[in-house]
Amino acid sequence: MTSTTDKAGQPKSETPEWEIKAAKQSRLAFGLAVAELARRDEKVAAISADTIDLFGLRPFLEASPERLIEAGIAEQNAMGIAAGMATTGMRPIICGYAPFITTRSLEQLRNDVAYANQRVVIGAACGGIVLAMAGGTHHAVEDLAIMRNMPNMTVIVPADARQTWHAAMATEQLDGPCYIRLGGKFDEPDVTELDADFRIGRADQLRNGDDITVIACGALVAPAVATSQALAHDGIGVRVLNMHTIKPLDRDAVLAAAVETGAIVTAEEHRVTGGLGGAVAELLATEQPTPMRMIGMPDEFAIVGPPAQVREHYAMGEGAITDACRDLMR
């Protein structure tokens, strides 16, 4: 008899590996995971905030139209619907835009989902400044700070499409709400392996190093790895932690890095206040004071322009990470 579980005892995926690897964009990998979760559990339903095509949900809509609700450009309604469904034992998964699902529906998110500790998963596409050309209304550079301050909320920022798949599938283990920040309509470099172990709340050490540590999440993980590779040629060992879970933070990994390498650089496509940098700084300030630099957006609204130009303007990339590492090494 053919086994229906994998080595870890989890149900085997019906989604072909090639399809996950071909996704290349975290929003599409999340959509594939939604369909897979729905195949495993009839209580899973998707709620779209005018994002069916953004998340690649059309095949799911055609296969299970009764389990996909189109709320339209009405994030407050989407969040309220999800909270209501969760109270009946359903497992709603919201698919929305990061800048809107975290601000427009904040009251419902806080009171109906987080306060009530409802089992609602929020997939938030276009996090950071991937929609920078659309102006300040479409920048999502405070979403992690908002979500970190919601009791009961798990906050995940996958490094690539492959890790997004694992993050979404891992929400089966959660009994409360979860926010997963995703990218936009750009291919994302692969920095993780599809067969890599993924655990909520446990950082991935992508590069070894004893001189300094870069702790990064999301879009800045790849530049962090590139920095480590470049500085290795100069004899500088840069440890790279992919801190995919912002909350709960992997305290052990952060504190070990502080003790073993003596200096920390954080890197995120988010304001330096309240996100990954803030979480790491709060921990180090109370447990292990350590020299530190934070790469991210300053306390201002971002300029408008192509994402690459905005990243360069605010020094959110490999060059800035490298400079911060060298500065701390002096």
What are these regions (language model features)?
Residues 1-181, 186, 197, 318, ...:
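Thiamine diphosphate
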